[in-house]
Amino acid sequence: MIVQDSVCSELMRGCEEILPVPELEKKLQKGIPLKIKAGFDPTAPDLHLGHTVLLNKLRQFQQFGHEVIFLIGDFTAMIGDPTGKNVTRMPLSQETVLENAKTYQHQVFKILDPDKTTVAFNSQWLNKFNAVDLIRLAATHTVARMLERDDFNKRYTTGQPIAIHEFLYPLLQGYDSVALKADVELGGTDQKFNLLMGRELQKHYGFEPQVVMMTPLIEGLDGVKKMSKSLDNYIGINETPEQMFGKIMSVSDELMWRYIDLLSFKTGKEIQQLKQSVLEGKNPRDVKIDFAKEIVARFHDQTQAEFAHNKFIERFQKGNIPEDLEELSLVIAEPIALAQLLKQIDLTASTSESIRMVKQGAVKVDGDKISDPSLKLPIGKSYIIQVGKRRIAKLSIQQAD
């Protein structure tokens, strides 16, 4: 019983909410492998560390002998998950969905054990649905129940349109749990309504309801908004070792602990020991370096993690400019404002970000901190431009004919 209690405690660690906890404990105490399901709609080709919070939890279940079902929602992706959206999402083509799904499989096996993972596609059963099946599924829930979901409710009360097919999405996702006979389903906190729909439909179809385990949405590099490619505050798992290492080293010490808690493969006990060592005088930077190496090694290898570490020391801690820095060329008719220039050479994602970075004192030209975003660099010269700790470019500005 002590062993089972420690397993249960480790599996629950890092979860935002578990519904219901007693049922999870009861299922684990049976001592038989459980079916652990997690669904992913392949609506974008690349994953970032935010996605791996859930994948890490799946990996834990594998380590304790349970069966992990990595469900690719190729059918539902062609509908588009309306969760958190204030407008109807455009459906994707089957070709795009299948191409993204292939990329997903390659990426997730950097974390999951392929020999202990069943990859399923919900088109396997949803493609067999006929009109009668769909109507019967729709009849299990009311419009009033659907409007309990925050995003639907907001759109309804503000007069924004809700397409009928959007109501079908949570029902179809829930039916996946029926088809797979899932014991546990994992998902982000933003998926709560859809996850609970799986429980309700399993009860309706006469199955033991799944336990729902929700993992938190991890903050991006800014420490405020959730990690997202669209907000440019993410660490992609396909990024180069140097990019990964530099981004992790750029986060605050407070955010570092959040990342370690949710992303490290260390046990809860080991993490507590790390925190205690910092309280006793260990430099948090050293903990961050070890964590950065752990993440880089996971998605690349240990040799590249050490190489990225050495490059980081050379570039940032010693203040050196890399010798192999590629020179960019910008041909313009007349000088342009620095804020616009930074965006043009992809050191920032937008002019507004450029302005913000300059005002924060994060932009240097040839080692000098710049305070004026409207500064115009003379044409006919080369410059070393730095934005923050990890974005750097050698730029030659040339006169257009």
Curated annotation (Swiss-Prot):
PROSITE patterns, alphabetized: AA_TRNA_LIGASE_I, S4
Record function comment: Catalyzes the attachment of tyrosine to tRNA(Tyr) in a two-step reaction: tyrosine is first activated by ATP to form Tyr-AMP and then transferred to the acceptor end of tRNA(Tyr).
Locations listed in the record: Cytoplasm
Motif 'KMSKS' region mapped to chain: 226-230
GO MF annotation terms: ATP binding; RNA binding; tyrosine-tRNA ligase activity
Keywords, comma-separated and alphabetical: Aminoacyl-tRNA synthetase, ATP-binding, Cytoplasm, Ligase, Nucleotide-binding, Protein biosynthesis, RNA-binding
Protein name per the record: Tyrosine--tRNA ligase
Originating organism: Legionella pneumophila subsp. pneumophila (strain Philadelphia 1 / ATCC 33152 / DSM 7513)
EC numbers on record: 6.1.1.1
Family matches, as Pfam families: tRNA-synt_1b
Major enzyme class: ligase
Lineage: Bacteria, Pseudomonadati, Pseudomonadota, Gammaproteobacteria, Legionellales
Residues where ATP binds: K229
Oligomeric and partner information: Homodimer.
Similarity remark: Belongs to the class-I aminoacyl-tRNA synthetase family. TyrS type 2 subfamily.
The reaction(s) this protein catalyses: tRNA(Tyr) + L-tyrosine + ATP = L-tyrosyl-tRNA(Tyr) + AMP + diphosphate + H(+)
GO biological process, one term: tyrosyl-tRNA aminoacylation
Keyword flag GTP-binding: no
Highest taxon listed in the record's lineage: Bacteria
